[in-house]
A protein has these predicted regions:
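Short low-polarity hydrophobic stretches
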Residues: 4-5, 64, 173
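ADP-ribose/NAD+-binding catalytic cleft of ART/PARP-like enzymes
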Residues: 1-59
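Short, flexible beta-strand-to-coil junctions
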Residues: 1, 6-13, 71-72, 87-93, ...
Length: 174
């Protein structure tokens, strides 16, 4: 089974692997400052770990490649400015590096979710990575005018030992 992850160009994935936030102090933190209310890298990592143990070692992925429409041109820019990598979850699991998988449903599927709830995404722990849905994602629901770029589509967060997915578990797809 695969998940798809995007990283802005240029990047060092072929040499360093995919880094979680806990392993990437050079990450652009502007989004996380707003999201967490923290003012330092260390504070952001602590905030993530308060969400649940291992959260700072999480790496987001989609069950299929991202697709843009005329209503979601920001996704087109995102895709065109990034390298897409597939993550081999079977091998990660077989080698004991996959600690947990969480599912973030579309906000459309969570009627009790309030718009002002912006502290962290809703994450539901899956029993096993084989519980990842293989149903097609409805990318047409993404709309730049509504904001929340990926809130309308389901995605996954894999918690990885050490916070790094080594290069041998990933394939550059574009």
């Amino acid at each position: 089974m695969k998940l798809y992850h995007y990283i802005a160009r240029p990047n060092t994935v072929s040499k360093d692997g995919i880094l979680s936030l806990s392993q990437n102090p050079r990450a652009d933190l502007s989004y996380y400052y707003k999201r967490t209310g923290e003012t330092t890298y260390e504070g952001i990592i602590k905030w993530f770990e308060k969400c649940f143990e291992g959260r700072s070692r999480g790496i987001r992925g989609f069950s299929e490649p991202v697709k843009w429409t005329e209503n979601s041109l920001s996704l087109k820019q995102f895709i065109e400015g990034s390298d897409m990598y597939s993550i081999d979850l079977d091998s990660l699991s077989d080698d004991g590096l996959l600690e947990a998988v969480y599912f973030s449903p579309s906000v459309m599927d969570v009627p009790t979710l309030k718009k002002e709830w912006v502290n962290d995404e809703l994450l539901i722990r899956l029993h096993d990575y084989n519980d990842i849905s293989v149903r097609p994602v409805d990318w047409a629901i993404c709309n730049d005018k509504l904001g929340w770029r990926f809130a309308f589509v389901p995605y996954y967060v894999v918690i990885v030992k050490g916070g790094i997915i080594p290069p041998k578990y990933i394939t550059k797809e574009n």
